[in-house]
Design a protein with these regions (language model features):
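Alpha-helical transmembrane segments of multipass membrane proteins
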Residues: 88, 92, 183-191, 243, ...
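Membrane-interfacial helix-loop connectors
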Residues: 119-177, 251-325
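Intrinsically disordered, low-complexity non-transmembrane regions of multi-pass membrane transporters
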Residues: 1-23, 39-61, 196-224
Length: 346
């Protein structure tokens, strides 16, 4: 008993660490997401628009198209991207591992459901949420919980649903809410069930004594920050440039090209899984393409797959999840988008 008491006294719980983490979360999200989106909701209600399509007016030169899109894209997301990397590194050194294991570490459906719930305040795009999901996996969060958090950020974004209701109509927002929730929970649950967790079990988080031997909080955080940055950001930038060059072929804006057929439902579902966009950018994209003649069914497919995953975000998570899990996630999201669009054809 005396030995146990002395051990507990030697390593008291440091409340300032989770307190600091949640302070960064609240201040960061207020500055990057909550406060800007509050004003944007009034703009959407008054004008029934949140801006131009980020895909429109692509340069015919692929190199110029890649550069132009990268500039527009990164100007839109850089604050959220910085916040995502910051939170993804801080969660590894400030949040006790047992907290995450008790909530998101379970392989049962409870962990997946909690991951979806915890994603709601984040409102991040799939690429900005990816570093946070990678940090969660370093803390041994289950695949289901981390995937639900990652996909829930863009698909269940409350602000996006409000924008969508004012711009595209509340029927679109309702379909997005129901289908988005079903997609997040179904995909995360199936990946958790079908992919062996032990294949790439995350490295165990060291105990208090091991942490002490690795240095103080600041040095451990800098190591986590650098590792996360190096594993995610360079490939992120490269993938955005490549997709920027290909955008004109992925999403044709010519009048009447994308009609209301099963072929285009499947094509848009797949294209949406490949491309990368900022938060809520699917709304003006779909609005512009529908004005050019795109049918409702392909539009619904895009509204599910375009925000949910992208090639850059999947690549960013290549060291956090088994390759099979990422391929399966992309395929299942495309299938969910195709099913939602196909139901609109019935």
């Amino acid at each position: 008993m005396a030995g146990q008491s002395s051990s507990q006294a030697a390593s008291p719980f440091q409340w300032w660490k989770p307190a600091l983490f949640f302070l960064v979360v609240i201040v960061g999200l207020w500055y990057v997401k909550w406060q800007p989106y509050y004003g944007k909701a009034f703009t959407a209600a008054e004008t029934h628009s949140i801006g131009k399509s980020i895909l429109a007016q692509a340069d015919a030169n692929p190199l110029m198209a890649a550069w132009d899109y990268a500039m527009v894209y990164f100007l839109a997301v850089w604050k959220a991207a910085v916040l995502g990397v910051l939170l993804g590194s801080l969660i590894q050194v400030l949040i006790p591992r047992d907290w995450l294991l008790c909530t998101l570490g379970q392989s049962r459906f409870q962990g997946t459901l909690l991951g979806a719930i915890f994603s709601l305040p984040g409102m991040m795009c799939t690429c900005c949420a990816a570093p946070v999901a990678a940090g969660m996996r370093k803390q041994q969060v289950s695949m289901g919980g981390a995937l639900a958090f990652w996909m829930g950020n863009p698909l269940l974004n409350p602000a996006t649903l409000v924008f969508m209701g004012f711009v595209l109509g509340w029927q679109f927002a309702l379909v997005r809410l129901v289908a988005g929730l079903a997609t997040v929970l179904t995909v995360a649950t199936l990946v958790q069930k079908w992919v062996k967790e032990a294949a790439t079990q995350p490295v165990a988080v060291p105990d208090v004594q091991a942490e002490a031997s690795q240095g103080g909080f600041f040095s451990r955080w800098l190591r986590a920050l650098w590792t996360l940055f190096w594993n995610t950001i360079p490939v992120y930038i490269l993938a955005v440039l490549v997709l920027g060059a290909a955008r004109v072929w992925l999403f044709p804006h010519a009048d009447g090209v994308v009609d209301n057929t099963l072929f285009w439902v499947i094509a848009m579902a797949i294209a949406g899984c490949l491309f990368v966009i900022p938060t809520a950018a699917e709304i003006p994209i779909v609005q512009t393409m529908m004005l050019a003649g795109m049918g409702t069914a392909p539009a619904l497919a895009l509204l599910i797959t375009l925000p949910a995953v992208s090639v850059p975000s999947l690549i960013m998570l290549r060291k956090a999840f088994p390759a099979k899990a990422l391929w399966l996630t992309g395929g299942l999201v495309a299938l969910c988008g195709a099913i939602v669009g196909a139901l609109a054809l019935v």
